[in-house]
Amino acid sequence: MHLSPRQLAAVLCLWSVLFLLPFGRAAELPIVIGALYAIEACVRDPARLRGAQYRLAFLAFAAYWLPELVSAFDSVAPRKSWTEVATDLRYLPFAVFTVDALVLAAARRQLAWWSALLLLFWILDALAQSAFGVGFGGALESDRVSGIFGDDNLKLGPVLAVLAPITVLVALDRYGRAFALAIWALAALAVLLAGARGGWISFAVVTLALLWRVAASPQRFVGGLLLAGVAAAAAIGTSYQLSERFAARVDRTLAAFDGTRGGLETALAYRASIWQTALDMSLAHPFNGVGVRAFRHDYLDHAAADDQWLALNPEQGAFHAHHWVLEVASETGAFGLACWFALWIVLWRHWRALAREQRHGVAAYSIALLAMLFPLNTHFAFYSSFWSNLYFWLLLVWIAQLPPARERLP
């Protein structure tokens, strides 16, 4: 089925969120356009909102937005919190737009294809920057490949790692396992060279999930796991010998095993102090936290005297918790955690109700969300424009892929 120009424009608007992600707040433009379109459409036809996918999208929005609303009433930084509460309202009509834009299977396939091509371009650009010292994002000036994101915005590794399932599974569906394996290898190399250890962990999660997805038996899964392990060891060993910058990051990571607190802090880039402070904030404000986006404003009151972040930034310390569970707990409290976990229980039940072939349609986005939320990792701030845009994009596209309830397993 061919899409009309209007339908293609809607898919293009949705795809543009990914396309503009490396360029700061530019990614807000298609979100606002989509939100305005949805508001106009709902005014014309309010009955359109009765579908199950709309209700699930509203639930996803509520689980994110209600915690910040409740946290804002006694926030330690009320202006910051209420501003965040107001601006995040844009995700509600954008949720409607996303479901509308992807109502047709052809639209969903088109979005996946365009997204896969975009991500492949990011991968090749990152590899070119590593090989030749320059790419579309500029020259290689730091100790990490930055790709299209640029040297002042080192987010390539985590973003590529999270989105890699889209490219790999599109390649698998269109061109077979050999081509998908080649795409996986290129993505792995780009994530490795990007140097973000959080990205490495996310990509490991993605790899395990992809192997489980394509393996026809436990024996094949174990065999694939062994091959992936050998390939990873070879790539890491080669990079360690050829790149002093990469070797330095590996050495910092291995410092975690020297048995000292200092070694652990070095390996975690001093995040252990942030996590302890976030935990203290959560205990001091158990119900609704210190207020959304108020973490930095309350950091000084809870940080230890020898906190490394106070030396780096005496006025505020760390900006966010660097872990999504601790971010939600410290900024929105137990109420926020309850909302987030309730949402994921509901989504898990929806996923469990899908037949095997229906799960294939949501597989790429399921794996991406798993990698994004994997708890044994570090994370960007989820209550921020950059990471929340990607989170909602993945979550809403996942919801839009779901078949009507009558087509699911009883």
Question: What is each PLM-predicted segment?
Answer:
Residues 1-5, 177, 234, 353-363, ...:
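A juxtamembrane structural motif centered on a specific transmembrane helix
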Residues 15, 93, 107-141, 149-217, ...:
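Alpha-helical transmembrane segments of multi-pass inner-membrane proteins
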Residues 38-49, 203-228, 354:
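Perimembrane helix-loop-helix junctions
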Residues 193, 214-262, 266, 276-284, ...:
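A membrane-periplasm/extracellular boundary helix in multi-pass inner-membrane enzymes
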Residues 262-273, 288-332:
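Long extracytoplasmic/lumenal interhelical loops at the membrane interface
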Residues 331-371:
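Hydrophobic transmembrane alpha-helices and their immediate junctions
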